[in-house]
Amino acid sequence: MLKLRQLQKKKQKENENSSSIQPNLSAARIRLKRDLDSLDLPPTVTLNVITSPDSADRSQSPKLEVIVRPDEGYYNYGSINFNLDFNEVYPIEPPKVVCLKKIFHPNIDLKGNVCLNILREDWSPALDLQSIITGLLFLFLEPNPNDPLNKDAAKLLCEGEKEFAEAVRLTMSGGSIEHVKYDNIVSP
């Protein structure tokens, strides 16, 4: 009986200590931490934590950098960086995702805005960081000309895959199309 009481007190003390470690973390930050803990990244994706969800400072929202390096498709050998900015209502609202490189892609505009349905109308709190990263990878394997942010890229993809592939190769190495200079995103 004495042993049972000691175990109970020990467990209570552990619970008090663990709950006092992160008392100020919001539900959004706790969820993001859980997403990060369960993340299973493919070898073509790298993730860097810019602002940790562990920070109790609510003036700085959690930020991640995701680097996608497609190993097939039009963007093979590219290295594309994205910022993911999580607000305090995540997962009710999706994070703000911005491409940090100027690339020629039907679903990414010149300012870096990303058109991905799961980041807009198809977002659900059931989706997580793994879903977002999978969606970003999919954008490079299957660009969608039917829902474009870059209408020139979408038009070229619809007109012919060969011409689109040539334009992507040109722009990936820092070339220009229609007086727009694109960033060199070719992996060394």
Curated annotation (Swiss-Prot):
Pfam families, A to Z: UQ_con (PF00179)
CDD domains, A to Z: UBCc_UBE2F_UBE2M (cd23794)
Name assigned to this protein: NEDD8-conjugating enzyme UBC12
Record field: compositional bias (Basic residues): 1-12
Catalytic residue list: 115 (glycyl thioester intermediate)
Subunit composition and interactions: Interacts with DCN1.
EC number: 2.3.2.34
